[in-house]
Amino acid sequence: MCTSLTLETADRKHVLARTMDFAFQLGTEVILYPRRYSWNSEADGRAHQTQYAFIGMGRKLGNILFADGINESGLSCAALYFPGYAEYEKTIREDTVHIVPHEFVTWVLSVCQSLEDVKEKIRSLTIVEKKLDLLDTVLPLHWILSDRTGRNLTIEPRADGLKVYDNQPGVMTNSPDFIWHVTNLQQYTGIRPKQLESKEMGGLALSAFGQGLGTVGLPGDYTPPSRFVRAVYLKEHLEPAADETKGVTAAFQILANMTIPKGAVITEEDEIHYTQYTSVMCNETGNYYFHHYDNRQIQKVNLFHEDLDCLEPKVFSAKAEESIHELN
């Protein structure tokens, strides 16, 4: 599954953050795609060339499969599961660009520089149904995108084409569709951070056992609707972040409330579904932050510290084991 959200800091930095929740061990790494790098789409074999360099979390499978990333123009994107709702074209349409679902992040970050650019270019995009060999299934995906304006988009593939929504909450999870999640928020308008006052009932003076009574009814389970509501609530009432570092910390703190520990969710196939990594990327600085399940220390790679005109993709080896800062 997965949860994603965006934040704006007081100094106008914009971050896109996500959890990667999955049962299959993805084995992802941070990878840089340089400018003018050619890759061939599995849809039609056509060669594509990157206009913009980008960095993100991915895995090499012939082409590199990216789950999320940020490019040099400040456009960021994350792919999340959309089971039961994602529908793709069965055949190639003439006079359009053809890609398969798991190539969308690569395509959009390599040729688009803003959300307006995305809106324009997807008019001539066809996403063709094709299995990802690694999982032997067609990945049902939808995508959240952000840029330096602070605006956000959600793109969902449906039977009648690609649906593009301005994502005002700046939150996305999984199925149902985005409009359903936004409508569902109306059920939670009474939830608030402020403690409720003591009250007299039946001749008794009643007061809360402790803080948090205003959040009674805030869903705490791991289903997509509950995670969506929880993320919107936490983002809405978050103490403003002064700068990028504070914003990144805040994003990790919010997503910690959606993180799934091993054993808490078991699939129908008796597989452990858990949060494999959490990442946060800043649209202005090109910083890509992340931590893995087995190492909670935040690690960082900066896009602009690299040669963006290098000839081949570059893989960054992350420390997998827990890193503990010892004080004595």
Curated annotation (Swiss-Prot):
Q: Which UniProt keywords apply?
A: Antibiotic resistance, Hydrolase
Q: How does this protein's activity vary with temperature?
A: Stable at 40 degrees Celsius but steadily loses activity at higher temperatures. Rapidly inactivated at 60 degrees Celsius.
Activity regulation as described = Penicillin acylase activity is enhanced in the presence of the reducing agent DTT, indicating active sulfhydryl group in the enzyme. Activity is inhibited by the chelating agent EDTA in a concentration-dependent manner. Inhibited by cephalosporins and conjugated bile salts, substrates of the closely related bile acid hydrolases. Progressively loses activity with increasing concentrations of the denaturant guanidine hydrochloride.
Q: Which InterPro entries match?
A: CBAH/NAAA_C (IPR029132), Ntn_hydrolases_N (IPR029055), Peptidase_C59 (IPR052193)
**EC number(s) of the enzyme?**
3.5.1.11
Q: Which reaction does it catalyse?
A: a penicillin + H2O = 6-aminopenicillanate + a carboxylate
Q: Does the keyword Signal apply?
A: no
Q: What does the record give under GO molecular function?
A: hydrolase activity
Q: What is the effect of changing C2 to A/S?
A: Loss of penicillin V acylase activity
**PTM comment for this protein?**
The catalytic N-terminal nucleophile is exposed by a simple removal of N-formyl-methionine, unlike L.sphaericus penicillin V acylase, which undergoes a post-translational autocatalytic cleavage.
Q: Which CDD domains match?
A: Ntn_PVA
Q: How does activity depend on pH?
A: Optimum pH is 6.6-7.4. Functionally stable in the pH range 5-12 but loses activity at acidic pH.
Classify the source by domain of life.
Answer: Bacteria
List of catalytic residues: C2 (nucleophile)
List, alphabetically, the Pfam families matched. CBAH
Enzyme class comes to hydrolase
Record GO biological process: response to antibiotic
Q: How does it assemble?
A: Homotetramer.
Described function: Catalyzes the hydrolysis of penicillin V to 6-aminopenicillanate (6-APA). Can also use the synthetic chromogenic substrate 2-nitro-5-(phenoxyacetamido)-benzoic acid (NIPOAB). Shows negligible activity with penicillin G, and no activity toward ampicillin, amoxicillin or cephalosporin. Lacks any detectable conjugated bile acid hydrolase (CBH) activity.
Protein name stated in the entry: Penicillin V acylase
- Native organism is Bacillus subtilis (strain 168)
Q: What gene is it encoded by?
A: yxeI
